[in-house]
A protein has these predicted regions:
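Nucleotide-binding/hydrolysis machinery
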Residues: 1-37
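Short glycine-rich loop/turn motifs that provide flexible caps or phosphate-binding loops at active sites
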Residues: 6, 126, 264
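P-loop NTPase catalytic cores that bind/hydrolyze ATP
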Residues: 14, 264-269
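Short Cys/His-rich metal-coordination motifs, predominantly Zn2+-binding knuckles/fingers
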Residues: 22, 206, 264
Length: 485
């Protein structure tokens, strides 16, 4: 009632139609209704779809099917190698690929191509194929949608804990069980619920990649000018005769985060008005352009840091002292306590900074924690990149050796390379420094958005969080040095 409706009855009808399409349980809520779509943030971005060759490739019916068709059979081969191959992970092709190539590809890929990995993911592709054979198409429960952030945060922390506490890297069989379990969940939820509900609301790996993808220099967004003035049929959501709608149930003009986009290109194929843009942007720009921040998402980001740090410190004197306090308990219990303490400590440190910063910003501590906690994302991402870079370099060297020994192709022998440890350490430290700088810049930009005039006040507001970022950077430096070298 407080909106002027410059588009008259057509804009009103379109707005209500969109609201009905995305509403849950047939109830319209304020968050289902959005207007004034014409405001877009296109400055400083390059639309790659202006290239005819790129546009043709994305609109092709082979995209991304051709990649999924290759990934799905490979996934089953990988499972066979994990279950039936050698128990020694250094001799098992499946285990080497999973940990030396698979995980690094996911982490680095979240930056390089955002959440496109979820379009390639064989588990999601197999679930989608199962859906075509049998589908009940039940609407995903609204209460699970509301708790999705918590479910993803807890399940992602469980995956990180499981990997460390059970030394999953040393057991190809257990690695296979984990991948098989995720695939079965994906198939079950694909058959029972509408669209790709598992990938959107529940998948722990997809949830982690979605959060990390916020830092990516790529984004798929709609030109909301076109949506508001020309579209009344919403093919991006409902689909067309040749292509289904958004698998994540997103309305293109309301999409503002890489977290909810797997870059499958369905909206590009379906939109008859050419409103979709594949933008090249400044990495991390999405964070300082956000209008709403969720404390749960920030908790997940900081907890990912805590989980990573707990593993890096596991071989150091801090863990030794902690272990001696509980030496009479089973080792897995002691590590679980250490894992929990690391997560809670990282969150507590950020919370204290938020309590101080909120006194300057004039917002609540929760709002401040949500905003600046997300600013730590570049540091967390590069921390994971630095961690997995070591395995990519030092475990990856065994991959061609094992291929050569297994398949007796001499070409694999020529692919063996070695990298001096000092080079690896330098690359890891450089990544962490870049992430720390990115966090500081984004933190400042977030304060700038809150106080656009008084520079001194912005600096005072952001300083506690900059200090936290520097402390967390120092722990990463120490952890990498002590764990790997």
């Amino acid at each position: 009632m407080g909106y002027s409706w410059p588009g008259n009855d057509r804009e009103l009808a379109t707005t209500l139609k969109r609201a009905v399409l995305i509403s849950a349980d047939g109830i319209l809520r304020p968050q289902d209704i959005y207007f004034d779509l014409r405001r877009i943030e296109a400055d400083g971005k390059i639309n790659l779809l202006r290239s005819p060759s790129i546009l043709k490739a994305v609109k092709s019916p082979l995209f991304p099917v051709i990649f999924q068709s290759a990934a799905a059979p490979f996934f089953f081969i990988l499972l066979i190698l994990l279950f039936l191959g050698p128990a020694n992970p250094s001799s098992n092709v499946g285990a080497l690929f999973s940990w030396a190539i698979g995980w690094p590809t996911m982490i680095f890929g979240a930056f390089i191509w955002a959440r496109f990995w979820c379009s390639l993911c064989p588990m999601g592709a197999i679930g989608h194929l199962a859906k075509k054979l049998l589908s009940f198409n039940i609407p995903f429960p609204a209460f699970l949608k509301q708790k999705s952030d918590w479910i993803i945060a807890m399940s992602a922390m469980f995956i990180i804990w499981l990997e460390i506490a059970t030394d999953l890297r040393s057991s190809p069989f257990n690695t296979g069980l984990l991948l098989l379990s995720i695939m079965l969940f994906a198939v079950f939820f694909s058959i029972v619920f509408e669209r790709q509900s598992w990938c959107r609301y529940l998948c722990p790996l997809g949830g982690m990649m979605g959060v990390l993808a916020k830092v990516s220099p790529f984004e798929l967004r709609a030109d909301r000018n076109v949506c508001a003035s020309q579209c009344s049929t919403n093919e991006c959501f409902v689909g067309s005769s040749s292509c289904e709608g958004c698998p994540f149930g997103q309305m293109a003009p309301s999409l503002r985060s890489n977290r909810f986009c797997k870059l499958c290109g369905n909206c590009v194929k379906n939109c008859p008005h050419g409103a979709m843009n594949l933008n090249l942007r400044i990495p991390g720009r999405e964070i300082w352009e956000m209008r709403q921040f969720g404390a749960i998402t920030s908790f997940l980001v900081i907890s990912m840091y805590g989980g990573l740090l707990s593993e890096l410190l596991e071989t150091g004197f801090l863990y030794d002292r902690f272990y001696h306090l509980f030496f009479d308990l089973p080792e897995i219990v002691v590590f679980t306590l250490f894992f929990t303490v690391a997560i809670l400590s990282a969150n507590a440190l950020t919370l204290v900074a938020a309590m101080i910063s909120s006194q300057i910003s004039g917002e609540t501590t929760k709002e401040n924690f949500a905003r600046y906690g997300l600013a730590l994302l570049p540091l967390v991402m590069t921390g994971f990149m630095a961690y997995h870079l070591y395995y990519l370099i030092n475990m990856g060297v065994y991959f061609p050796i094992v291929l050569w020994q297994t398949f007796h192709f001499s070409i694999f022998e020529r692919l063996v390379i070695t990298v001096p440890p000092s080079w690896t350490l330098f690359a890891q430290q450089t990544l962490v420094l870049i992430g720390s700088l990115g966090t500081i810049v984004i933190s400042y930009r977030l304060s700038k958005g809150k106080h656009p005039v008084r520079i001194s006040r912005r600096l005072i507001e952001v300083m506690p969080h900059i200090l936290v970022a520097l402390v967390l950077t120092g722990f990463l430096f120490y952890g990498i040095q002590s764990f790997f070298y």
